[in-house]
């Protein structure tokens, strides 16, 4: 009984945190339609899944790209629907396996469905928790497809590759200049990246021209 009471109290905290989401650019009527946002999430969810399989290239701030037509979104939507149906089939075949597969989509649903997050229509950090489901599925697949010694060897190789990629990515966080330069190199139309670079250059001597160019690009 007390366990359920504690769970219910956590819902109250969640509700309180949700009261002010509109001021942070989350909600309806803020300039991005639910339909266009939902179309964009078809692409976003597949991107998160691909990055879970191999996290490259990672972009700190992808800006607010938006798909506005079915013609642009239907390849993503078709593949996403197929994956959801596959997860439902897995649920029918094996409840634990299906639950893990569905967990990826369910955990993404609050921010990757139809309620627009205007300032960041695609954001890699939303996939942090859902990625646990992908890791579990990968481990189960390796365990079932490979013999135990090969499983250990494969896991060691994957861990080594992931560690190297993590080390390389952490280098981008050594300074604001490096982080936003990397972001701009991968998302060249991102106004926030231009703005932050402009702020960095404006704070330095003899960098006024660079700051001015980035301020113009941010407008």
Predicted stretch roles:
Residues 1-219:
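Polytopic membrane enzymes that build or remodel cell-surface glycoconjugates and lipids
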